[in-house]
Each structure stands twice: as C-alpha cells, then as structure tokens.
A protein has these predicted regions:
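Short pre-functional
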Residues: 1-10, 117-118
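Short, polar N-cap/turn motifs at the start of nucleic acid-interacting alpha helices
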Residues: 19-26, 104, 121-145, 168
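Alpha-helix N-cap/helix-start motif at helix boundaries, enriched for small hydrophobics
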Residues: 10-15, 129
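Catalytic-site neighborhood detector that most strongly recognizes the C-terminal catalytic loop/helix
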Residues: 34-38, 133-158
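Short, basic (Lys/Arg/His-rich) helix/loop patches that form interaction surfaces
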Residues: 58-62, 73-131
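C-terminal secondary-structure termini that scaffold catalytic or DNA-interacting sites
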Residues: 70, 81, 159-169
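Conserved tyrosine-mediated DNA breakage-rejoining catalytic core shared by Y-recombinases
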Residues: 5, 14-52
Length: 169
C-alpha cells in the first residue's frame, strides 16, 4: 500500500474504504488528511489497493511499524537484493563507512520514495507528485527522488530544450 500511495506509514495504515471518493473525472481517489502536515491529498485509487481493502472488508489489518519494516526487508531478501552497499554513518563526532546488505536498508519510507521516483521517471511533473505525496516544496520532494546520474541525464534529455535540438541516436 505504501508503494502505491506514496504516503507515510502513519497515513497509509489508516486508509480505509470510507476515504474513497469519486471526483468529477469519474475516477476513484483516496481522500486523506495527512497526520504530520494536515495536508489533504487525493491519491488515485490503484486497483491493487482497492483489492487489498476489499480483502480486509474496507480496513487494513493493524500491524506495528517495525513488523512492516521486517516484512519489507524479507521481501527485499527474497528478491535477491542482498548486495553489500557502503554508506557513510556518524556516531557522535566519529564518522565511518558501514557495509550493509541492500535489503536491510529497506523500510516503510522507502515505499514513499519509490512512488515519487517511479512517477518522476514516468514523466510526472514535480507538482503532480507533490499533489499526491503532500510534499510542501519541490526541494523537499527532490531529496526523496532516488535517481543516479545517468537517469537524471536521460530525464533532462526529454525536456523541450533537448527535444527541439534532436539528440543524435
């Protein structure tokens, strides 16, 4: 549900069928008031979220955040996302490089970033993504996007400036 709504765990755990509304475009949305910011967002209702809500009679099962994080890590491991990655960490004044399995770094907030990144890669504008995630500024949102340098360049190549130049193939 987190990867399909782009919400914080505190918000997507509260999603229920009473939040589903149909807007003037005829599509169904989840109308949600975010706990942290108080922002009201309208999230397009993905058929998979609808199926999950149907399965549980309109209310998601109650699960502790840590248990959700454990399941996300297990899924990452089952998918083979076990490569060792290095990250800079700090404890007090001491900085060091830690080595961890990629799957062990996955958590509920990864779901929120994944939706934002996937939407952006698919060509959604920052303002469209912000309307769903509830980020208050583009700068805030940009820190959530996980793109490597080649992905950033390929996205830039789709901008009007470059499409008018006709990039060599």
């Amino acid at each position: 549900v987190g990867c399909l709504t782009g919400q914080r765990v505190s918000d997507y755990k509260r999603i229920n069928s009473k939040m589903i509304v149909t807007l003037t475009d005829g599509n169904k949305y989840i109308k949600l008031k975010q706990e942290k910011t108080g922002n009201i967002v309208y999230i397009p209702l993905d058929y998979r979220v609808a199926a999950i809500l149907d399965k549980y009679n309109g209310t998601l099962p109650k699960v502790y955040d840590q248990k959700i994080n454990d399941h996300i890590k297990e899924i990452g491991e089952a998918l083979g996302w076990t490569e060792i990655v290095e990250l800079d960490e700090q404890r007090g004044a001491m900085e060091y490089t830690a080595k961890k399995r990629f799957c062990d770094l996955l958590k509920t907030h990864t779901c929120r970033r994944s939706l934002a990144t996937n939407m952006y890669k698919a060509g959604a504008s920052l303002s469209s993504i912000m309307a769903i995630t509830g980020h208050n500024s583009e700068q805030q949102l940009k820190t959530s996007l996980k793109l490597d340098e080649s992905e950033k360049s390929m996205l830039a190549a789709k901008e009007n400036y470059f499409t008018k130049l006709r990039i060599a193939k």
